[in-house]
Amino acid sequence: MALDELKAAVPDYAKDLRLNLGSVIGNSDLPQQQLWGTVLACAIASRSPRVLRELEPQAKANLSPEAYTAAKSAAAIMAMNNVFYRTRHLLSDPEYGTLRAGLRMNVIGNPGVEKVDFELWSLAVSAVNGCGQCLDSHEQVLRKAGVDRDTIQEAFKIAAVIQAVGTTLDAEAVLAE
């Protein structure tokens, strides 16, 4: 199992990450589609080749072709939106908030899977990318759809752990050169 290989690669100084990786993925209460879509989207967002290589096959095996594509779409569209909306939010000139975005985001309206799942994946990727405005927006949509806080927190816990593991393993790879 790739998850076990990934856990084994985490150095002892980051043992907490190893344990967290096992618990947030291996013991998650999320339905399989929500879990593995979150894992795949966050692995892509982490920008860690090792993490993506290790987790993608298991995600693909646990997702329908439509969900697999939608999770990748969530990572792709949020890569754009998180930069755009975070920048708009951080600029001190509020006029930028009144301007038309002018960016295509059709996949958000028609993701090919349940809207709640796509929103959850988008929230998790927004956590990795640090866009507060996007986090608030996706959290509100999820809450209005009846998703509880525990489920939402589960998604951003997965995001946090995958990001941390990616950072750690990428650093170790550079230090080993």
From Swiss-Prot:
It comes from the Bacteria. The active site is at residues 131, 134. GO terms for molecular function: alkyl hydroperoxide reductase activity; disulfide oxidoreductase activity; hydroperoxide reductase activity; peroxiredoxin activity. Keywords: Antioxidant, Disulfide bond, Oxidoreductase, Peroxidase, Redox-active center. One of its GO terms (biological process) is cell redox homeostasis. It catalyses: N(6)-[(R)-dihydrolipoyl]-L-lysyl-[lipoyl-carrier protein] + a hydroperoxide = N(6)-[(R)-lipoyl]-L-lysyl-[lipoyl-carrier protein] + an alcohol + H2O. Its EC number is 1.11.1.28. Pfam families: CMD. It is an enzyme of class 1 (oxidoreductase). InterPro entries: AhpD, AhpD-like, AhpD_core, CMD-like. Gene3D superfamilies: AhpD-like. Disulfide bonds join 131-134. PANTHER family: ALKYL HYDROPEROXIDE REDUCTASE AHPD (PTHR33930:SF7). Homotrimer. Antioxidant protein with alkyl hydroperoxidase activity. Required for the reduction of the AhpC active site cysteine residues and for the regeneration of the AhpC enzyme activity. Belongs to the AhpD family. This is Alkyl hydroperoxide reductase AhpD. It comes from Streptomyces avermitilis (strain ATCC 31267 / DSM 46492 / JCM 5070 / NBRC 14893 / NCIMB 12804 / NRRL 8165 / MA-4680).
